[in-house]
C-alpha cells in the first residue's frame, strides 16, 4: 500500500473509533445504566479498539509455523492462527499475576481471545488509559511488533488513544471476558459463511451425548430458539439462518411421561468429511445407546419444524391434514420469522405417527410419507419460507425406533419473493396461498450399512454440513452487529455531512461578509474618486485662469511693439538701448514665471493647510482627553473647563488664572438602623495645601440647592439628582447619586470662583466657609483644633469624625474612588 492509502486507512480507523466512543458516551455517559456487551454500541467500541491495535502488526512466519506444528501435534483440527494478534505485544507490558489471570480463563484458548479479554477487562476496570500509556511509551519496542505505517506508530493519532480511553471512565462497563466467542475471528467484520464454516468443527462433540443429555438438549432448544439443525443445504451459496422472534412452547411438552423411554440414536459427523468428499459414509453412534435407569421402554423424540399455531390432533389420535396458509404479514414492513415447536411424544402416539409417516422398504425403513399440513394462525406471519426445508429422518440402527427429523433441502426452495404481494400487505387478507408440495415432504434416510450414497445426505465440500443452535445465534448476532456497524457508519456519515453543511454555511456567511466589506470599500473609493475629481476640476479652472492671464500679457506685448520709435528734437536718430518688443517679451516671460511660482506656492499652501488641519484635529482630541483626565484627577477649575470652549484664548486665560480648589465625594456611609437608616456622603475639599472632610446627608444637599436657587437663578441650570422615596438604598442608585452630587458641587464651586474675584485671587478655607456654610467642618467637643482654625461644636456624626489631630495633608483620593 502506498503512503497515502496508509494514511487514509489510519484516518478511517481514527474516525470510526471516535464515532464509537461518542456513541457510547451519548448512550451511557453520566448515567447509572450498565454498558454490557449485549449492546451493539459496546460491541462496536470493542471492535474498533481491536482494529486499531491490530493494524500494522508484523507477521512472524517462524512463530506461526511453530504454533501450527504444536496444534497439529496436539490433535487440534481447527485452522491455525496465521494472522498476528496484538496480544503478543500486550503481554509484554503485563506483570506475572495479570498474565496468569488471562491464561487461566476457562473458555479462552487462543491469543486472539486473550487480547479481546484483556481489552474488555481494561474497559470494565477503567484501566485502559493506563495500559495504553504503557503500550505507547516504548517506541523501540513498538517498532519490533508493528510496521512503520501502523496506527500506533503514528504519534499524532496514537496520542489520542489514551484521551479517548479516559473519556470512557464515566461509563460503567460490565462485559463478559471469559466467553468462548472471543476465540473466533475478529468480530468487527464477520460474514455468515465464515461463521458457518467454523461451526462444523463442534458438531461431533455437541451430538455425541447420552440419551438423557440429548433429550435435555432438545428441550433446551425448544425453550430457547427452537431451531432445526441443517444437515444438507442443496445450494452452494451460504445459507441465511432464519430464527423466530417468539417461541411458543406447547404446554403438553412440559408433561413428559416417564413410563418408558425409547433409545435415541444420534448421527454424528466428523470434521474430516468436509475434506474427504462425497464418497465417505456417515458415522453413527452405536446402536446400544444407554437408556434411562427408571424406564425400560423406549420413547421417540421427533424434531419438527412448524409455524406458530396450534397443532391439534383428531379424536382418533391422528393429526388432521390442512393446507399451510399465509394470512398475515409483519408490521412496519419487516417480515417475521415463524415459530418452531419441538415435541416429545408418547409411544402410543408415536406408533400411530409411524404408521402415517413410514413404510417398510427392504431391511431399512426408507420411504416417503406426506406430512400433515398445518393451517397457519391468523396472527402469524410468513417470512422467508425457503429457510425451512423438508425434514429428513435419520435412522441409526435397524432395531431402534427412534426417528429424528432434519431439514433436507437447502435455503431458497421457497422464497418470500415468490409469495403474492397481496397476501403480505395486511394481516386480514382473505387469500390463502399454498406452499408447494415438495417443500413439505419428509424423507427417511437409510442407515449407512444399507449402502445409501453419501451424496444424497452430505453437501459439497465448500458448504458447512451443519450448525448448532449456538452457532446460529452467533451468526445472527454477527449479522446484527454488522447491521449496527453499518447504521453507526451511516450515522457518522450523516454527522460528517451535517458538519460539512455547517462549514459550508459558515463559509457562505464569511463570503457574504467579505462581499459587504468589498462593497463598502468600493463605495469609499468611489467617494474618494469623486472628491479628487472635483478637486481636479477646481485645479483645471485655476489653470485656465492662469493661462488666460498669460495670454493677455502676450497680447499686451504685441501692441507695445506697434508703438513708433521716439526721435530727438534735433532730428537726430536716437538708437534705443533695447527694442520695446523685447522688453514686452521679457516682461511677459517674467509674469509667466511668477504666475507659475504662485501656482506652485498655492498648491504647497493647500497641502500644508491640510497637514495643519489634521494635526490640529489630533491635538484637539488629545487636549480634550487630557482636560477630562485633569478634571477627574485634580477636580474643577475656574470656569466650566469640562465644556470645550471654541475660544482658545479664553481657555488659555482660564487655565493661566486657575485657582487650586478641588472637591470630591469619594465615599458614602450607611448610618442608622432598620427603617431609620440613611446614607452620609463624605465631601473632600482641598484648597492648595489645606484639606478637610465634611459629612452631609442628601437632605442637606437639597437644602443647599434650594438656597442657591433663591440667591442665584443660574443654579437652576445645574444638574441636581432628584429625590427618590422608594429604592434609595440600592447600591447602584447611591453610587449614581454620589457622582451627580460631586458634579453639582464642582459646578457650584466654579460659580463661586467666578462671582467672587477676591476668593479666586486668594482662596482660603475661612473665606469659603463664610461664603458657603455647607463646607463647615464640625469637630466633636474636646477635640483640639489643628493648625487651621476650626469652630468648636458638637459633631452630628461623631463616629465619622476624626478622633485625633489631623495631619496637615492627607493622602489624596485615588482615581478609582472618583
Curated annotation (Swiss-Prot):
Q: Where is this region: Disordered?
A: 267-299, 343-375, 441-462, 781-818
Q: Which CDD domains match?
A: PX_RUN, RUN_SNX29
Point out residues bearing the modification Phosphothreonine.
644
Q: Which residues form the RUN domain?
A: 36-180
| Modification sites for Phosphoserine | 268, 291-292, 330, 344, 447, 452, 642, 645, 649
Please name the InterPro entries in this protein's record: PX_dom, PX_dom_sf, Run_dom, Run_dom_sf, RUN_SNX29, SNX29_PX
- Segments passing through the bilayer: none
Question: Which Gene3D superfamilies does its entry note?
Answer: 1.20.58.900, Phox-like domain (3.30.1520.10)
The family this protein is said to belong to: Belongs to the sorting nexin family.
Name this protein carries in UniProt? Sorting nexin-29
- Name the source organism: Mus musculus (Mouse)
Amino acid at each position: 500500500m502506498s503512503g497515502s492509502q496508509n494514511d487514509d486507512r489510519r484516518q478511517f480507523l481514527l474516525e470510526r473509533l471516535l464515532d464509537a466512543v461518542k456513541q457510547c458516551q451519548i448512550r451511557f455517559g453520566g448515567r447509572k445504566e450498565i454498558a454490557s456487551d449485549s449492546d451493539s454500541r459496546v460491541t462496536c467500541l470493542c471492535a474498533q479498539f481491536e482494529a486499531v491495535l491490530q493494524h500494522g502488526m508484523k507477521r512472524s512466519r517462524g512463530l506461526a509455523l511453530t504454533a501450527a506444528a504444536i496444534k497439529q501435534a496436539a490433535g487440534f483440527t481447527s485452522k491455525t492462527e496465521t494472522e498476528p494478534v496484538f496480544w503478543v505485544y500486550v503481554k509484554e507490558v503485563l506483570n506475572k499475576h495479570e498474565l496468569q489471570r488471562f491464561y487461566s480463563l476457562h473458555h479462552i484458548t487462543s491469543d486472539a481471545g486473550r487480547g479481546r479479554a484483556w481489552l474488555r477487562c481494561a474497559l470494565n476496570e477503567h484501566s485502559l488509559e493506563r495500559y495504553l500509556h504503557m503500550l505507547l511509551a516504548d517506541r523501540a519496542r513498538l517498532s519490533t511488533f508493528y510496521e512503520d505505517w501502523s496506527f500506533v506508530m503514528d504519534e499524532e493519532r496514537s496520542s489520542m488513544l489514551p484521551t479517548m480511553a479516559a473519556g470512557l471512565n464515566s461509563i460503567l462497563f460490565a462485559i463478559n471476558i471469559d466467553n468462548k466467542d472471543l476465540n473466533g475471528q475478529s468480530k468487527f467484520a464477520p460474514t455468515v459463511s465464515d461463521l458457518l464454516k467454523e461451526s462444523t468443527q463442534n458438531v461431533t462433540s455437541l451430538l455425541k451425548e447420552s440419551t438423557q443429555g440429548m433429550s435435555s438438549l432438545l428441550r433446551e432448544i425448544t425453550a430457547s430458539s427452537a431451531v432445526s439443525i441443517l444437515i444438507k443445504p442443496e445450494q452452494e451459496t451460504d445459507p441465511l439462518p432464519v430464527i423466530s422472534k417468539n417461541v411458543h412452547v406447547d404446554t403438553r411438552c412440559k408433561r413428559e411421561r416417564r413410563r418408558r423411554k425409547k433409545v435415541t440414536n444420534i448421527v454424528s459427523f466428523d470434521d474430516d468429511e468436509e475434506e474427504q468428499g462425497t464418497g465417505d459414509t456417515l458415522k453413527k453412534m452405536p446402536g446400544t445407546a444407554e437408556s434411562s435407569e427408571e424406564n425400560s421402554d423406549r420413547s421417540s423424540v421427533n424434531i419438527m419444524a412448524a409455524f406458530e399455531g396450534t397443532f391439534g390432533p383428531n379424536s382418533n389420535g391422528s393429526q388432521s391434514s390442512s393446507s399451510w396458509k399465509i394470512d398475515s404479514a409483519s408490521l412496519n414492513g419487516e417480515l417475521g420469522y415463524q415459530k418452531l415447536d419441538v415435541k416429545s411424544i408418547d409411544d402410543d402416539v408415536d406408533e400411530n405417527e409411524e404408521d402415517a409417516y413410514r413404510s417398510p422398504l427392504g431391511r431399512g425403513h426408507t420411504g416417503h410419507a406426506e406430512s400433515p399440513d398445518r393451517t397457519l394462525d391468523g396472527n402469524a406471519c410468513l417470512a422467508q419460507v425457503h429457510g425451512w426445508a423438508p425434514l429428513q429422518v435419520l435412522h441409526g440402527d435397524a432395531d431402534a425406533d427412534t426417528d429424528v427429523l432434519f431439514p433436507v433441502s437447502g435455503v431458497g426452495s421457497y422464497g418470500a419473493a415468490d409469495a403474492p404481494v397481496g397476501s403480505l400487505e395486511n394481516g386480514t387478507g382473505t387469500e390463502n396461498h399454498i406452499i408447494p408440495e415438495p417443500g413439505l415432504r419428509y424423507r427417511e434416510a437409510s442407515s449407512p450399512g444399507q449402502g445409501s450414497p453419501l451424496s444424497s445426505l452430505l453437501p459439497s465440500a465448500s458448504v458447512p454440513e451443519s450448525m448448532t443452535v449456538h452457532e446460529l445465534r452467533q451468526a445472527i448476532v454477527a449479522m446484527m452487529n454488522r447491521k449496527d456497524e453499518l447504521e453507526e457508519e451511516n450515522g457518522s456519515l450523516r454527522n460528517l455531512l451535517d458538519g460539512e453543511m455547517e462549514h459550508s454555511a459558515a463559509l457562505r456567511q464569511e463570503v457574504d461578509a467579505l462581499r459587504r466589506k468589498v462593497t463598502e470599500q468600493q463605495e469609499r473609493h468611489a467617494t474618494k474618486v469623486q472628491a479628487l475629481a472635483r478637486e481636479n476640476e477646481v485645479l483645471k479652472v485655476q489653470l485656465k485662469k492662469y493661462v488666460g492671464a498669460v495670454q493677455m500679457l502676450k497680447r499686451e506685448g504685441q501692441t507695445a511693439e506697434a508703438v513708433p520709435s521716439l526721435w530727438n528734437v534735433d532730428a537726430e536718430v536716437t538708437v534705443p538701448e533695447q527694442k520695446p518688443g523685447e522688453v514686452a517679451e521679457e516682461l511677459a516671460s517674467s509674469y509667466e514665471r511668477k504666475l507659475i511660482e504662485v501656482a506652485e506656492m498655492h498648491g504647497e499652501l493647500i497641502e500644508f493647510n491640510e497637514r495643519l488641519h489634521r494635526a490640529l484635529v489630533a491635538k484637539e482630541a488629545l487636549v480634550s482627553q487630557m482636560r477630562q483626565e485633569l478634571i477627574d484627577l485634580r477636580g474643577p477649575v475656574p470656569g466650566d473647563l469640562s465644556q470645550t470652549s471654541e475660544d482658545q484664548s479664553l481657555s488659555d486665560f482660564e487655565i493661566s488664572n486657575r485657582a487650586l480648589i478641588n472637591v470630591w465625594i469619594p465615599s458614602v456611609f450607611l448610618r442608622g438602623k432598620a427603617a431609620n437608616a440613611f446614607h452620609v456622603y463624605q465631601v473632600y475639599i482641598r484648597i492648595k495645601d489645606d484639606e478637610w472632610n465634611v459629612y452631609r446627608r442628601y437632605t442637606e444637599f437639597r437644602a443647599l440647592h434650594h438656597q442657591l436657587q433663591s440667591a442665584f437663578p443660574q443654579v437652576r441650570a445645574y444638574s441636581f439628582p432628584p429625590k427618590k422615596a422608594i429604592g434609595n438604598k440600592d447600591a447602584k442608585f447611591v453610587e449614581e447619586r454620589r457622582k451627580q452630587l460631586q458634579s453639582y458641587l464642582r459646578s457650584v464651586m466654579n460659580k463661586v470662583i467666578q462671582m467672587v474675584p477676591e476668593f479666586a485671587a486668594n482662596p482660603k478655607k475661612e473665606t469659603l466657609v463664610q461664603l458657603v456654610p455647607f463646607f463647615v467642618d464640625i469637630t466633636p467637643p474636646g477635640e483640639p483644633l489643628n493648625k487651621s482654625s476650626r469652630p468648636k461644636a458638637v459633631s452630628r456624626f461623631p463616629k465619622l469624625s476624626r478622633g485625633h489631630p489631623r495631619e496637615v495633608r492627607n493622602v489624596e483620593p485615588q482615581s478609582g474612588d472618583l
